[in-house]
Design a protein with these regions (language model features):
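Active-site core of glycosidic bond-cleaving carbohydrate-active enzymes
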Residues: 231-526
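Extracellular/oxidizing-compartment recognition motifs
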Residues: 1-227, 235, 251-254, 271-278, ...
Length: 526
């Protein structure tokens, strides 16, 4: 009650929709110690936000660099600014405007064939009527000028993922390069790894991965910076290793890992997004997503030699292992979550690899990694329990989901076959025959990959392990669909969410396909 308040020039702010600022409402000198606030009202007490109030040890959000526009194109009743890179942050507006002049900045990743900004992929509602309403305000920062000279405005309580900005409310004389500056922001994490070679496509793909990793790191890994901005667990798990190789993220991982453990339900289950307001326990999770619980501390241990996260999370490990044992069907298999998401040229949930295969294999890998971590901190009873759980899942897959006549994993597809090899479902003496079957599956697709995100995480590593790194490289960089090179050929400055032959994708800034950067370092360079 000792705090005083007054109407703010920030008239609206939202994490996803944007910020509105009316400079005419500014109070000169309000932040100075000698300012007279006697005319202001006392603050009103309000309930604390849900969640635990504690010091955040993750790196803060910081300005990383600034970008000037590459081009400015008249479009409709405004001007389209192209910054050439799809990153995350805000625009700094510098303008000499008139009092009451209203300037709108609409942010987007892509342009339509007619040259106008495409925001149709940034949907918030399945209800078309609600979307038609919200797209009039989504991703927009609005500034109302004070007048009387040069004004500078940078939004404070929002950020956007974008390459393009459509500016309306300015004159042609005001639509100059100095009007907008792209202020690129993300967590203040250091870049520690890198890769460059003689192949321009490889170099561009490495840059795309780095750009998507950074654009999607705001205290913790998010799925995309323009639409959901959620901490999807599988996205972070799929990228955990390559991010640790390339970026110093261990402090941020440690902080987010505490949130992951706090989000765990009493029965041991995890939600698909963290933090969550309660959503994600009944859909959007499962072993391939929940593996973030094991992967973050495991890879921090492998690459940084630290065991603090393991010790802090040991109780959550045990709860989750017990939870898995309660979710098996009568055959001992798991079929409870999301599977090989975003399979090439399919709807995201139209899996080729059977869900019972990917779920049970991922549960095996989770238990196996937890066994290693328990051993690292001397928790022998817990280690033995994790070993028993892992062995049970592995044996179940071997007994029920492998055709031993042809050494083919269930689904007879690249994802299942590569996962069975990579995660050691096949024993060493069986892997040669299993790999031959994988090569046949690749040949059936004309030498191109045909996987979702779970398959892409392992396929190229398996090919390199068996002396087929050149084939893997061709599959990655080739310009023909499907390939990462296809994205580059179609102008991608960051990693996309989907491989679609028509180039249409829900997001053009997703990091969960980014393990190719670790493949470049681990397998291509040796």
């Amino acid at each position: 009650e000792t705090f005083r308040t007054a109407p703010s020039p920030i008239t609206f702010d939202d994490y996803r929709f944007g910020e509105h600022y009316d400079a005419r409402l500014e109070a000169d000198g309000w932040a100075l110690s000698e300012f007279d606030d006697s005319g202001w009202s006392f603050a009103v007490s309000a309930p604390m936000p849900r969640g635990e109030a504690r010091l955040c040890e993750a790196e803060p959000i910081a300005v990383r660099r600034e970008i000037k526009p590459l081009s400015i194109t008249p479009s409709g009743d405004g001007f389209l600014y192209d910054f050439g890179e799809n990153c995350a942050g805000v625009c700094r507006l510098t303008v000499n405007g008139t009092a009451g002049q209203r300037i709108e900045l609409l942010h987007g990743e892509w342009v339509k064939e007619d040259g106008t900004l495409d925001i149709e992929r940034i949907w918030f509602h399945r209800d078309e009527n609600l979307w038609q309403r919200d797209k009039k305000i989504v991703h927009r920062d609005v500034y109302t000028c004070h007048g009387g000279g040069t004004e500078t405005y940078t939004p404070r309580f929002t950020y956007h993922g974008f390459r393009y900005v459509f500016v309306s409310g300015v004159t042609s004389a005001q639509a100059i390069p100095e009007l907008l500056t792209y202020v690129v922001m993300n967590s203040d994490i250091k870049e520690k790894g890198g890769f460059i070679c003689s192949d321009k496509t490889v170099n561009k793909l490495f840059e795309c991965t780095r750009r998507s990793d950074l654009a999607n790191f705001y205290y913790f890994p998010t799925d995309c910076p323009h639409r959901e901005k959620h901490g999807w667990t599988a996205d972070a798990a799929l990228s955990a290793e390559h991010m640790l190789i390339n970026l110093d993220v261990k402090n941020s991982y440690r902080e987010w890992m505490r949130n992951i453990c706090k989000a765990q339900a009493d029965d041991g289950s995890l939600p698909g997004i963290i933090p969550t307001g309660g959503w994600g326990f009944k859909w959007g999770n499962g072993p391939a997503w929940d593996c973030v619980l094991a992967y973050l501390p495991y890879y921090v241990y492998v690459y940084c030699g630290e065991t603090e996260m393991i010790k802090e999370s040991a109780g959550a490990f045990m709860s989750y292992l017990h939870y898995l044992t309660t979710r098996v069907d009568r055959n001992g298999l798991l079929k409870i979550g999301l599977g090989d998401w975003c399979h090439v040229d399919r709807q995201s949930s139209a899996y080729v690899a059977p869900l019972e295969f990917t779920d049970t294999v991922m549960a095996f890998d989770i238990a196996r990694k937890m066994e290693v971590m328990f051993d690292a901190v001397g928790m022998t009873a817990q280690r033995d329990f994790a070993h028993a759980v892992a062995l049970r899942f592995k044996n179940t897959v071997r007994e029920q989901l492998i055709d031993w006549g042809t050494y083919t994993a269930a689904g007879s597809c690249q994802t299942s076959q590569a996962m069975a090899i990579f995660y050691d479902i096949f024993e060493p003496g069986e892997k040669s025959a299993a790999f031959s079957r994988l090569m046949s599956l690749i040949d059936e697709k004309g030498g191109r990959f045909d996987v979702g995100v779970l398959g892409a995480r392992v396929l190229f590593h398996v090919l390199a392990q068996f002396g087929k790194a050149e084939l893997a490289l061709k599959m990655i960089v080739g310009p023909e669909f499907p390939s990462y090179g296809f994205w580059i050929e179609n102008g991608a400055p960051s990693l996309w969410e989907n491989f679609r032959h028509n180039g249409r994708t829900a997001s053009r800034n997703h990091h969960f396909w980014g393990d190719i950067s670790s493949w470049f370092i681990q397998d291509l360079s040796g």
